From Swiss-Prot:
Domain of life: Bacteria
Region (Disordered) location: 1-20
Gene Ontology molecular functions: structural constituent of ribosome
Biological classification of the source: Bacteria, Bacillati, Mycoplasmatota, Mycoplasmoidales, Metamycoplasmataceae
Composition-biased stretches (Polar residues): 1-11
Entry keyword set: Ribonucleoprotein, Ribosomal protein
Family label: Belongs to the bacterial ribosomal protein bL27 family.
Pfam families: Ribosomal_L27
Organism: Mycoplasmopsis synoviae (strain 53) (Mycoplasma synoviae)
UniProt name for this protein: Large ribosomal subunit protein bL27
GO biological processes: translation
NCBIfam families: L27 (TIGR00062)
SUPFAM superfamilies: Ribosomal L27 protein-like (SSF110324)
Length: 84
């Protein structure tokens, strides 16, 4: 015979790892070509000048320059403008 009763099982106790989403470069920071600017799920921020969107909606720089976040038509855009 068991000296203690059987312990109950739980269906909880799991969690996924955080995905580290959000801004990786902020307004005014210098971005090299290919640098990740914003990691996201869906299009919270849209690509602007010299910025492209990858398959997982990550925004990255196409040219060297300074990052600029802009609001246009109720959307947030991020652009990279070359240094003058």
């Amino acid at each position: 015979m068991a000296t203690t009763k059987a312990g109950g099982s739980t269906k909880n106790g799991r969690d996924s790892h955080s995905k580290r989403l959000g801004a990786k470069l902020y307004d005014g920071q210098f971005a090299k070509a290919g640098a990740i600017i914003y990691r996201q799920r869906g299009t919270r921020v849209f690509p602007g000048v010299n910025v492209q969107r990858s398959g997982d909606d990550t925004l990255f720089s196409l040219a060297d320059g300074y990052v600029k976040y802009e609001n246009k038509r109720n959307r947030k855009y991020v652009s990279v403008y070359p240094a003058k």
